[in-house]
Amino acid sequence: MKIIDCTTYYSEDLMLDVRFNILNDYVSKFIVVESKYSHSGKIKPLNFNINNFPKFKDKIQYMVIENEPQGIIPNNDNSASIKRMNSLLRIEQSYNFILNGLHDVSDNDLICLSDNDEIPNFESKDFKNSKNDIFIFKQLFFYYKFNLFYDLIPWYGTK
């Protein structure tokens, strides 16, 4: 069984480096997807540089989304609800795009999908002997920064 870790990227090198270091002993491959568009639809430069992660270079598969998703709604009135809907379409596109990197997986491989700051704890579960097909990780909730730990609610992140 292989574990493939899939995430999207904007410009969070520090968080991605933390993620790679924590998961490296468990993961066979890291899939990193970056879009040429921000969630708000603005064209942005590509920020990912594989040379910033030399220790993990052989495990990283980097993929770029070149185009906007289908179904973007023109927003001439600057409507907040249309902005949100279009943002969700872009997020959905980035998660779906990860499928393009999963051509060499088998039925018993574990594919994990989460944002960079949602880092699963693989020490806590014996995946090889589990009968479950889907796992949802209960994770620690840090509110955007490591010094902002919030312990009043559980965070169910990586799936």
For the regions a protein language model found, what residue spans apply to each?
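Surface-exposed, flexible loop/turn segments at secondary-structure boundaries
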Residues: 11-13, 38, 68-70, 142-143
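N-proximal low-complexity "stem/linker" segments adjacent to membrane-targeting elements
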Residues: 1-25
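Conserved catalytic core of nucleotide-sugar-dependent glycosyltransferases
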Residues: 118-159
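Short, well-ordered alpha-helix to beta-strand connector turns
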Residues: 27, 57, 108, 131-132
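Active-site-proximal specificity loops/subdomain of glycosyltransferases
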Residues: 37-113, 122-123
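Short His-Asn-centered micro-motif
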Residues: 5-11, 33-34, 113-116, 137-140
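Conserved beta-strand scaffold positions in the cores of enzyme catalytic domains, especially
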Residues: 30, 62-64, 134-136
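Short loop->beta transition adjacent to catalytic acidic/histidine clusters or analogous donor-positioning motifs
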Residues: 3, 23-38, 56-61
